[in-house]
Amino acid sequence: MGAGTGAGTGAAGALGAAVAALYTATLPPTLPGGDAGELITAAYELGVAHPPGYPLFTLLAKLATGLLPVGSPAYRVNLLCGLLGAAAASLLFYTVFRLSGSYAGGILAAGVFSFSRLTWQWSIAAEVFSLNNLFVGLLMALTAHFEEASTAKERSKISKLGAFCCGLSLCNQHTIVLYIACIVPWVLSRLFRKTELSLGHLLKLGLCFLAGLLPYLYLPASSYLNRARWTWGDQTTFQGFLTHFLREEYGTFNLAKSETGSSMREMLVFQLAQMKSELSLPVLALALVACVSTALPTKQQKSPVIWLFAGMLCLYSLFFAWRANLDITKPLFLGVVERFWLQSGAVVAVLAGLGLATLASVGSAVLEGSRALPWLEWLSALALVSSQVWANYSACDQSNNYVVDKFARNLLSSMPTGAVILLRGDLPGNALRYVHYCEGMRPDITLVDQEMMTYEWYLPKLAKHLPGVYFPGNRWNPVEGVLPDGTLVFNLHRFLKVFMKVTRPGKGAIRSGRGVHVTSWFLPTLCLTQESGFILQEISITGLKTTAVSSPLPGKLSPTRRCGKPGDAPLLPSNSRMKTAFFIFDLAETASVNAEVKSQLYTFAYTSYKEIVNSHPNHPVNWHKNYAIACERMLRLHRVDVDPEALVSETVKHFLLYTEKAEDDPQRQDILQAVKHLKKELQGLRKMKI
């Protein structure tokens, strides 16, 4: 309290530089996955990112891609985010130091937060979370500065700067509004008690807040100019702007659209477990010490700030647990949710730093003249921070991670000239958009997002940037026709002039006819080239032999990262091949072809399934079912080059493996009944050999 501001600022800068050095050493050199591809592309094209638009991040990323002289556009934005994360660490240090005067406490707060797995992972990727961490640190630092201010003039200046920063922070991630909702009443009440809150000052604070929101003018400006080859939404009207700003397409107060999530209690338990895992139990204990310390008379002067921070933490945790409508028992959804716990983790880290300073202060008062206590304080802080770095450096080191980049490049490079690619899903969509638009790869190819075609703004905004693609209506709809408002909608059948339906393995079919040659590369992506006739052999060869799906890629992905599906993340190449195998198998089931071609298709699918399943012991459970069905079909072909006993044995084995792990499959009893008959058939085959 009242510590030297200059010394604290210098120490904060030095600590930020150290964090920046470690972050830079572990940056991914290319596209990291998740939303990064879409955010970078929107910035590069000066378009609008997904709701709520993230105008501040978009503009900063555009500056980074244009001004930084190193690496690819993705690397430059990754570097920007790393530097923002380092700045957030400096602000956390400054907050603790300003309130307690403890260097060790500040280092503890900044270090344990910055080098936790979750913070590190999302601070070196081109995502909005490091900028949000920066604003969390900034608002807490300004709060501490306001509390320590000694004059009315200084408090007035800080409150105006804080109002501006509150508005500016909302130009990035809206979850910070819960912290603003705590800080603003607290600041106003402090000003009111000191008789420093006049109507004129309140008006000035409001104007400063509105000035912070000015980056949102970028959204209608970008939408009006409509020069970006990738953008989201139509913000040229006030209603369109509000739709985007309020995230109405996702659900304004929900994390996702049309999802049923875990219970509030389950969410809070997961969050507490995550805090313990990410920050360690001693850090949580120190945060609790800070809260308990408010009962000590010697700490009364900073008690209001500690209670404010604790209130921010509680409000955010409770509200987020209430509205985060995702099932966090699924690894991918847990990965989506846990990123939003970063905001609460920053507060816990600051409280822990204050708790360490409190213990040192109380210890000094009890053991007057002891020289061991300062050393013990420093040793505790450095030990906890070092343990974070030691535990997480290897897992967070993405300096050799080219997985998503190679995935996108191999896929695009293997496409035929002039292809039109229908995209579904974040991984293919974001990755292909980035390498195509930002790095200029394969300018002859056209990317069309199948899911985005369902939005009424997609064609009016982007059709002119898709030359050579004819859209027979205003937007895509499962049932074609004219809507009551006069909108002409078309379905995929009309768009492709073929009937096509692709769903998850075991649930769908794909069919084709003359006029368009359709190649299924993997489930969420289809490539179309204009040719006459349906060339089955080319589909088989292209779908399985292309480098896009068969070249081995280095695995550095976590099941909780949004660059793959739960459990599939380390298996991107083989998962793509599995989907192609499913396509070939399903074609054999449904296509009107002669017996010889049908036999070739079943054989090709069986061979592919066998190779993929045997090469990956830890694969998704549905692979067992798909492979077992393929074996059963091969058995019915009565081919002389395949041992029927081996086929039945494999069918039984993999059906049983599937039913052990997929207890919720409604067909489970039917599968077990089929296994009984197959076992009898296996016994008969073995008797025939005797």
Task: Give the ranges of each region predicted by the language model.
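N-terminal membrane topogenic signal
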Residues: 1-15, 301-304
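Short hydrophobic/aromatic helix or loop-helix immediately within or flanking a transmembrane segment
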Residues: 42-71, 82-83, 90
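ER/secretory pathway lumenal C-terminal domains and tails of membrane proteins involved
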Residues: 125-126, 133, 146-162, 166-420, ...
